[in-house]
Amino acid sequence: MSATSVDPQRTKGQDNKVQNGSLHQKDAVHDNDFEPYLSGQSNPSNSYPSMSDPYLSSYYPPSIGFPYSLSEAPWSTAGDPPIPYLTTYGQLSNGDHHFMHDAVFGQPGGLGNNIYQHRFNFFPENPAFSAWGTSGSQGQQTQSSAYGSSYTYPPSSLGGTVVDGQTGFHSDSLNKAPGMNSLEQGMVGLKIGDVTTSAVKTVGSVVNSVALTGVLSGNGGTNVNMPVSKPTSWAAIASKPAKPQPKMKTKSGPIVGGALPPPPIKHNMDIGTWDNKGPAPKASAPQQTPSPQAAPQPQQVAQPLPVQPPPLVQPQYQSPQQPLQPRWVAPRNRNAAFGQSGGANSDSNSVGNAQPTSAPSVESHPVLEKLKAAHSYNPKEFDWNLKSGRVFIIKSYSEDDIHRSIKYSIWCSTEHGNKRLDGAFRSMSSKGPVYLLFSVNGSGHFCGVAEMKSPVDYGTSAGVWSQDKWKGKFDVKWIFVKDVPNNQLRHIRLENNDNKPVTNSRDTQEVPLEKAKQVLKIIASYKHTTSIFDDFSHYEKRQEEEEVVRKERQNRNKQ
């Protein structure tokens, strides 16, 4: 009798007579009905490959359902609920009937050792499945899904892995070694995260579960409760370090109370050095307080001595950046700090006198003294009401060139500017003066007025400018050397420059005579407080440094 056929008179959709019957009906069952289950599958008339091969994929299991659970144990018929000996069968696509194996026949032989034996291992030695199940009831397992019974297909046959919340694989322990089922059940409850954080944060859900305890302890031990007891009081543990740590910090604060004043002083240092005029010496004090961190109080007494050198060192780093920046700010706008630095670069003895006195009185450079003796700068009487003459705006890239123009009484513009100035000078000849209104790009003020005294010599290069690209030179005579802010002249607009303010002019921009009179009047009558003379020694020092660099370049080129 073939294992794949039951009764030739039975229709395909007819139910099994013994499926829903009780155990007492087994007396009415004939012995021939059990032959397909007791005999081996020896007839090779199957039209589909044998399922005993563990490497073949299951073709038909998804179409078969299992309405009962094997969680009832032990398997005896005395007083136990009726257990069916025959299972339902699914109709195969080829028209033949295929009977799934029954859990009752766990011994070798029959269908138990052929169909799915190697793959599923449905028949373990111990039939007490109640000890392997989860904390849920048996009825919940059967009602959870169509595959919620113990005969669910393993993840390998379904082509996927166990997903969180998939209750159809609670009884996969049948096809796994002891302990593997509990491991998977424990992993289902776990969430994404490392082991330590999950064990602590999910104390009530993960650690207390039977599945995870069995996995961690090995043979169902209770060793997991040891680490569980620690995180249960983690609120108390968190409260302990949270409270004493702030207290320790607060205690350390007053101990190092002397170090608290320096941080605000640092801000005052930055602000005072650039914006304020007076607190420049005060700003230098905090620089030394943070550097030695050990004892700030005794150093405050010794600070007056080292207070002065730091501001002297700072201008050396700040001043070289001035000619490089297009938006340059005159150092004298910082007043005493840069006035002292200018004198200190050339003469260190002038530092002591620089603090109480004003910046102009500090300057005692011999070159500046000779210039003041030879020229009467900023005259009180000046004829600004010109009857004839021409006035031009001169825009300089750096104040270094202004310093050298005053020192050598020369100037040089661009090629286009030289031609314009030379033509204006030759056109005026002796009819009237040609005045030049000097301003440094980005300075925000005019720095002086000079008169053009000679035509442009195009074949001569002065070689004293901060950049070597300038060619040609002409003589000038400086009349006013003072800083006049742009806000004093911004109201004067030039009709020959799109009616723009005179302060918004380009190099060699000519100013109409009537507007030039207004500009000259304001500059002559303006009472200045700063000028390039305040930083004359500073620029002298920079010129010496540039000459050293220029000589080194020349020596390298010769080699």
UniProtKB/Swiss-Prot annotation:
In brain, preferentially expressed in the hippocampus. It is found in: Cytoplasm; Cytoplasm, P-body; Cytoplasm, Stress granule. Coiled coil: none annotated. GO terms for cellular component: cytoplasm; cytoplasmic stress granule; P-body. It comes from the Eukaryota. Gene3D superfamilies: ph1033 like domains. CDD domains: YTH. Ubiquitinated by the CUL7-FBXW8 E3 ligase complex leading to degradation. Deubiquitinated and stabilized by USP5 by removing 'Lys-11'-linked polyubiquitination. Its main location: cytoplasm. Residues 279-305, 314-326 have a biased composition (Low complexity). The modification N-acetylserine is found at S2. InterPro entries: YTH_domain (IPR007275), YTH_prot (IPR045168). Pfam families: YTH. Keywords: Acetylation, Cytoplasm, Immunity, Phosphoprotein, RNA-binding, Ubl conjugation. Disulfide bonds: none annotated. Interacts with CNOT1; promoting recruitment of the CCR4-NOT complex. Interacts with ribosomes. Interacts with eIF3 (EIF3A or EIF3B). Interacts with YTHDF3. This is YTH domain-containing family protein 1. The gene is Ythdf1.
